[in-house]
């Protein structure tokens, strides 16, 4: 039994080491050492699928999931905690990500309905990469149903989402597409949720369209006591069961 226990602990140690050994700067290297140089030299965005230096972003096909894409800045922004995201001159990355959703349909071979799409960014402690990236991917069926059921309960003020999502507490706020286009969700979170501006890195944030064509912003806060790493990506299903 002692030997078995030792082997188990050894195996766990190997797993932990392997996870920690993953390079947290892979995305940054792809953007600054591959996509941007290749575009500047050859007008070829590869390995990204789109490079927009003037608009300040690139789009990359993620290796996880058949339809998941990442939108990333062409400046050095580590994540949601970066003060640049609250600067009015910074691109509205969430709205740019929404406009980039068409890459999913092109990859899929036919139009993907907007209700099936979600945008997310993870908290500082809930992410694996240290270059800002918004996940453009399918929403999970369970989350889609829960948001549909809460449609009438979500208003223009941040308020707790009834029942939470995936066992974690979330705040929800309704916005119109015009509001989403004009004002960054990062700014809305920082200015409207008490004390959020002091600890933006603790939050995961998501954007989903509702059946009435409004959008819902979803924010979850890091809480080790409830095992919530504030990985808003948890609302997504990168295998896209919602399309089957």
Swiss-Prot record:
Reaction(s) the record says it catalyses: a CDP-1,2-diacyl-sn-glycerol + H2O = a 1,2-diacyl-sn-glycero-3-phosphate + CMP + 2 H(+)
Membrane topology (UniProt): Single-pass membrane protein
Cell compartment(s), UniProt: Cell inner membrane
GO cellular component, one term: plasma membrane
Pathway stated in the Swiss-Prot or TrEMBL entry: Phospholipid metabolism; CDP-diacylglycerol degradation; phosphatidate from CDP-diacylglycerol: step 1/1
Top-rank EC class of the record's enzyme: hydrolase
Gene3D superfamilies given in the database record: HIT family - CDH-like
E.C. designation(s): 3.6.1.26
rRNA processing among keywords: no
Keywords of the record: Cell inner membrane, Cell membrane, Hydrolase, Lipid biosynthesis, Lipid metabolism, Membrane, Phospholipid biosynthesis, Phospholipid metabolism, Transmembrane, Transmembrane helix
Molecular function GO terms recorded: CDP-diacylglycerol diphosphatase activity
Main localization, broad class: membrane
Membrane-crossing residue ranges in chain numbering: 7-23
GO aspect biological process, one term: phospholipid biosynthetic process
Stored InterPro entries: CDP-diacylglyc_Pase, CDP-diacylglyc_Pase_proteobac, HIT-like_sf
Family statement: Belongs to the Cdh family.
Name the UniProt record assigns to this protein: CDP-diacylglycerol pyrophosphatase
Species this chain originates from: Helicobacter pylori (strain J99 / ATCC 700824)
């Amino acid at each position: 039994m002692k030997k078995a226990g030792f082997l188990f602990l050894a195996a766990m140690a190997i797993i932990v080491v392997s996870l920690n050994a993953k390079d947290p700067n892979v995305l940054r290297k792809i953007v600054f050492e591959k996509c941007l140089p290749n575009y500047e030299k050859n007008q070829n965005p590869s390995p990204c699928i789109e490079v927009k230096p003037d608009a300040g972003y690139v789009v990359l096909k993620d290796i996880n999931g058949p339809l998941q894409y990442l939108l990333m800045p062409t400046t050095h922004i580590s994540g949601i905690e970066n003060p640049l995201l609250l600067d009015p001159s910074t691109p509205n990355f969430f709205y740019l990500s929404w406009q980039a959703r068409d890459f999913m349909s092109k990859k899929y071979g036919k139009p993907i309905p907007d209700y099936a799409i979600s945008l997310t960014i993870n908290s500082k402690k809930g992410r694996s990469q240290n270059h800002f990236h918004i996940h453009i991917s399918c929403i999970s069926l369970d989350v889609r149903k829960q948001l549909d059921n809460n449609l009438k309960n979500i208003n223009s003020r941040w308020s707790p989402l009834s029942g939470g999502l995936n066992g974690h507490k979330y705040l929800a706020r309704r916005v119109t597409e015009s509001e989403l286009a004009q004002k960054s969700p990062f700014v809305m979170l920082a200015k409207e949720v008490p004390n959020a501006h002091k600890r933006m890195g603790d939050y995961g944030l998501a954007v989903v369209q509702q059946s009435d064509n409004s959008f819902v912003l979803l924010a979850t806060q890091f809480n080790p006591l409830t095992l919530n790493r504030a990985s808003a990506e948890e609302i997504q299903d990168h295998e896209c069961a919602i399309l089957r």
